Amino acid sequence: RFVQMYGDVVLGMKPKTKTEIDPFEAIIDKVKEEKGVKFDTELTVEDLKTLVALFKSAVKEHTGKDFPESAWDQLWGGICAVFDSWMNERAILYRRMNQIPEEWGTAVNVQAMVYGNMGNNSATGVAFSRDAATGENIFNGEYLINAQGEDVVAGIRTPQQITVEGSRRWAALQGISEEERAAKYPSLEESMPTCAAELIAIAHKLEDHYKDMQDMEFTIQDGKLWMLQTRNGKRTGAAMVKIAMDLLRAGEIDEKTALLRMEPQKLDELLHPVFDKSALKRALVVAKGLPASPGAATGQVVFFADDAEAWAEKKKKVVLVRIETSPEDLRGMAVAQGILTMRGGMTSHAAVVARGMGKCCVSGAGEIKVDYEARTVEMGGKTYKEGDWISLNGSTGDVYDGQVPTVQPELDGDFGAIMNLAAKYTKTLVRTNADTPRDARQARAFGAQGIGLCRTEHMFFEGDRIKAVREMILASDVEGRKAALAKLLPMQRGDFEGIFEAMDGFGVTIRLLDPPLHEFVPHQTATQKELADEMGITLAEVKAKVDALEEFNPMLGHRGCRLGITYPEITEMQARAIIEAALAVKERGIDVKPEIMIPLVGSLKEIQNQANIINTTAAKVFEEQGRSIPYLVGTMIEVPRAALVANQIAEVAEFFSFGTNDLTQMTFGFSRDDAPKFLKFYKEHGIIKTDPFEVLDQEGVGQLVEMGVKKGRATRPDLKVGICGEHGGEPSSVKFCAKLGMNYVSCSPFRVPIARVAAAQAAIED
C-alpha cells in the first residue's frame, strides 16, 4: 500500500490517458486473477509480498530509479510532493474558484502515523459535529473497518455511518431492511461503542472550544481512538446561516461574530431555484461556461427573443441560447427560464441583466456552436434543435442534457435574523439596480433601501414602445422627434410611478438614456421594411439612417450625456416624465425622492448643459401643476476624467454614483465583452489576480474612485456618494466602498443580501 500511494503521489505514476487504468491497479488485477480471488482483502501475506516486489519493479521501469528505501529520502520526497501540489491543475482551479492568492503557498505537516488497517478492531473515518448540508445540530460521519483514511476520502470503499440514527437514515434511502443493516452495515456506535462514545464526547469538546462546526478525521488502532485533525468544516449557505444563528442563540458567540461568520457570496445559494440533488447525480453535463447568474433552469431551446415570447405565451418553458445578447434580447430574457451564451464574461450584458432579473445564466460557453440559420446548437457531441430540452446550473456553469427537476429554496427565520443583524450594524446603505416595479419589489423584500440605478433604456424595448423610439430616431427634424417622444412620455411616466410606489419613500436614482441610438434600430432588412411601411418612408431612407448611426467604437461614441446634448428634447421628455410621475405619486400620499442621474459626464460643461435642461423642465412642470417636490441632479462617474475633475463636477452635481463597469473598461482599456478571451490566460499566468470586472481593482480603478470621492466632497461636503456597477454586490468591493465613506452601494436585487452582510462586516471590522 505504501509503495502504491508513494508511487502515485510522489513519483507521479498515474495513468497516461483517460482510458488507461492505474499502473498499480493493473498489477493488482493481474495477481488477483492468477490467485483466483475477487477482492484485495482475499490476498494472503505472501501475495502482498509478491505485489510489493512487482510494484517496485514497475517503479524502476517507469522512473528509471529504484524505489527509495531510506526513511529520510521517503520523508523528503513526501514533503516536496506536498509543496509541488500547490501548482497542480486542481489546486490552481480551486484557488481561482475561491480567489486564493497564488503567492500564499502551502504548508506541510509531519506527524507520526497510526494504522486503521490492523484488523477488525481498527478503523478510520471522518466526522462532523453538525450537519454540513443543513446546519442541524446532529453529530454525523462515516467510517471504515480495517482501512486507512484515504479509503474514506477517495471513495475506494463504501463507508458506514458512525451513529445508529445516521445508519438507519442511510439504510432507508438505500432500501435496506433494519435486520440487514444491523448485520452487514452496523454503525460505529454498534460495532465499537466505547470508541464511538469517546469520539462524540471529543467532538462536543472541540466544538465548545472553537465555537464552530468541526470537521474531524480519526483513526482507531487496535481498539484505541486517535484524533488526526480538526478544522472548521465547509458548509452550504443554508448551513452557514443556521449554525451561526444556533450558536448565537446558545450564547456561544455574539452578534458580531455571527455576522463575521457569514461568507456573503454563499447567501446566493439560498435565493435561487436549485436542482434536485438526487436528479443531478444522474444528469449528463454537455457543456460548461461561466456561472454568470445563480440558480437552476430547465427549458426548451430557443434562439430568438420573439420566439421566446411566443413560446412563453403558450406556457412553454424556454432557455434562450444566443451567441451573445444585446438590449434587443431583453424581451426574450424576461420570459426565459435561463440564458446560455457562447460569448461574454461575468459582467457581460447577459450576465448583468440576468442577475438583475434573478434569472439563471451561463455565459461564455466557448465550446458550444450556435447556428442561428439552422436553429441548432452543438454541445457535448450532440446537436440540439429548437425545442430540445436542456438544463442550466447558473451556480456552477454546467449545462445538462434534458430536463433536470428544480425545487424552490425555502428561506427560513434564520435568514431574516441574519438580515436584521446586518441592518443593526451596517453604516452603508444597500440599494438595488432595478428597471421595473417587479424588480423593485423583489429588492425591497430582500431589504434594499432605495434604487441606485434605474436604467430607462430597458423600458424602451417593451411592447410597442420600440416603435416610438425608432420613430424618434428616424425623424428628420426636431418637431418629428418631439412628436415621437410625446408618445413615449406617458409610458415612461407610468413606469416611474410604479417604481416610486414600490420604493415607498426610499430614494430612486434614474439614469437618463445611455446607450447609443444604433442599439434601438432594426438591422435586418425585413424589420427595416416593416418600419419603413409604418412610417410612410422608403426602405432606402431607413437603411441610410441605420448606416449613419453605425459607430466603430460605440462604447466611446455618441451615447450618454452626449445624446442629451445633441438631442436636448430626449432629456426634456425624460425629466418631465420623472417629475410628473413623482408629483402624481406624492399626491397619493407616498413620499418620493427622485434623483436624476446624467450618464457619461466627463466635464463641467457637459453636466451644466444637462442640468440646465432638467431644472428648466422641472420648473415648467411645477408651474403647470402649481406644486413642487424636492429632487436631486447628479452624475455617474464612469469616465476617468470625471474622477480627475470631480471637484469641478461637484459644483453642479448633488450626488455621485460610480459606474464601475465602464470606469473599469476605460481605465484598463479592456472591453468588457472581449476581455474574457485573454483574462483567463492573464489569471493563469499571474498577470492579474482577479477579473477586474468581477472584483474592483482597488490599486488602479479604486484610486480613481477614492480621488473622486475626496475631490467631490472637498467642493460639496454633503455630496451623496454611491456605487452602481456590478461591483456593488461583490463583498470585497463593498467593503472598500464602505471604507471610503460612501453613503450606499447598489447591486442587482438578488445580490442585495450579499451586499448587506458585506457592508455590516465592513462596519464591524472598521
Locate each region found by the language model.
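General secondary-structure propensity
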Residues: 338-341, 429-431
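Long, charged amphipathic helices and adjacent flexible linkers at domain junctions
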Residues: 97, 259-311, 316-318, 324, ...
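Beta-strand-connecting loop/turn residues
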Residues: 223, 375, 395-397, 662
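Glycine-rich phosphate/ribose-binding loops and adjacent secondary-structure elements
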Residues: 224-226, 319, 323-334, 338-340, ...
